[in-house]
Each structure stands twice: as structure tokens, then as C-alpha cells.
Amino acid sequence: MNLVLMGLPGAGKGTQAEKIVETYGIPHISTGDMFRAAMKEGTPLGLQAKEYIDRGDLVPDEVTIGIVRERLSKDDCQNGFLLDGFPRTVAQAEALEAMLAEIGRKLDYVIHIDVRQDVLMERLTGRRICRNCGATYHLVFHPPAQPGVCDKCGGELYQRPDDNEATVANRLEVNTKQMKPLLDFYEQKGYLRHINGEQEMEKVFSDIRELLGGLTR
């Protein structure tokens, strides 16, 4: 099964990726992991990517696509893969289509974990961290026994600057704009499937499992 997983920050993509990989035994391929592995192995493309990353620049499409091609040709991808964080643009999506066609494969599904903006805001702005021991809480999902105080060490809880409303709203807006053309592209191709990410974590995975059931029979 050849899958792409998509979702905005806070949609629970990481959790569902873990469950898919564990259940179906396919590798979870994230852009960050791919870059790190290619740089560690010292491949020509990995070294090129390192130059851009060290300068704080975006890695150009041709380098990213080359690294994805190298990764998908490895033995552990023969029975499928779960791509996460790639593609990010329609140009990358088209390159992925061409790359898979070269090796006689195609995507099965692009799974979009769909969560409304207001729910994402609540999830992302509710995080609180202990200044003393680093324990993490959430005002709604995992609140401390006493507001503002760490259960473990009694330290003060604070909100990280990048978890405040303005920063989170901006992050979601940027990601939404970037993702929309990609969702439209995969909708037209017939690969896109929306999963309601506002349900309990287990129900979200149950819906994904139901979708993927036809591929494993």
C-alpha cells in the first residue's frame, strides 16, 4: 500500500502515522528523516541538501525529489510506504507521480486528516509546560490538578511563545494556503480521502483501518 498522509498542525497526523506503520508494517517516511539519513550516509544528494540546510535555505525541489526517489527504491519500501511531509507542492506531487510510474507503481490513497480551524486553535494554544521540569499539560485534554502549577514538581506552568493565538493562527493560515492546491490536485486524481480528525484518536484510526481494509484483502 502506497500512501500519503496530510493534515494541518494539531490534526494528530503523527499519532495516526505511528498506528498505520505499526499495523501494516510499512515504513513511515518523513521529509526530515529522509534528509537526515541522506546526510548521514553522505550521498551526493544528501551533501547538497546539507549545504542548503546549513545556510538556512529551503532545499530545492530537484534535490528533495532525488532524495525521495533514493528512499523509495530501498528494500523496505517494496510492499509500500507512508509518505509524510512530502509532497508539499503540486510540482512535487507531479514529480512523485512520474517517479512511481517509472517503477510501475502508483499511490493508493492520500489520507487527509480533516480538523476545523477552531478545534486546531484549541488544541495548539492549550499546551502548557513546566518551567522547572519540562512536563507538558493541556488546559482541555490534560489539565494540571491546580491551575498553573505542575503536578510533578510544583513548578510554574507557562505557554511557549509559538503556542500563542496570533502565532498559531498565522501558522495555520500559511499551512492551509500551502495545502489547498495539493488537496485539489489529489481530489482530481481520485486519490484523496478525508478522515474526520475531530473524533477520539481510536475512532480516527478505526476509520483509516476501514479505508485501508480493501487494500489488504
From Swiss-Prot:
Protein name, UniProt field = Adenylate kinase
Q: Per the record, which residues fall in region LID?
A: 126-163
Q: Where is this region: NMP?
A: 30-59
- Residues involved in ATP binding: G10, A11, G12, K13, G14, T15, R127, T136, Y137, Q199
Which amino acid positions bind AMP, per UniProt?
T31, R36, D57, L58, V59, G85, F86, P87, R88, Q92, R160, R171
CDD domains, A to Z: ADK
**Gene symbol?**
adk
NCBIfam families, from UniProt?
adk (TIGR01351), PRK00279.1-2 (NF001380), PRK00279.1-3 (NF001381), PRK14527.1 (NF011100)
Show the domain comment. Answer: Consists of three domains, a large central CORE domain and two small peripheral domains, NMPbind and LID, which undergo movements during catalysis. The LID domain closes over the site of phosphoryl transfer upon ATP binding. Assembling and dissambling the active center during each catalytic cycle provides an effective means to prevent ATP hydrolysis. Some bacteria have evolved a zinc-coordinating structure that stabilizes the LID domain.
- In which residues is Zn(2+) bound? C130, C133, C150, C153
| Enzyme class name | transferase
Q: Name one GO biological process term.
A: AMP salvage
**The reaction(s) this protein catalyses:** AMP + ATP = 2 ADP
Which pathway does this polypeptide act in? Answer: Purine metabolism; AMP biosynthesis via salvage pathway; AMP from ADP: step 1/1
- Principal subcellular localization: cytoplasm
Q: Which family does it belong to?
A: Belongs to the adenylate kinase family.
GO molecular function, one example? zinc ion binding
Question: Which Pfam families does the record associate with it?
Answer: ADK, ADK_lid
Q: How does it assemble?
A: Monomer.
Q: Which UniProt keywords apply?
A: ATP-binding, Cytoplasm, Kinase, Metal-binding, Nucleotide biosynthesis, Nucleotide-binding, Transferase, Zinc
Q: Name one GO cellular component term.
A: cytoplasm
Question: Which purpose does this protein serve, as stated in its record?
Answer: Catalyzes the reversible transfer of the terminal phosphate group between ATP and AMP. Plays an important role in cellular energy homeostasis and in adenine nucleotide metabolism.
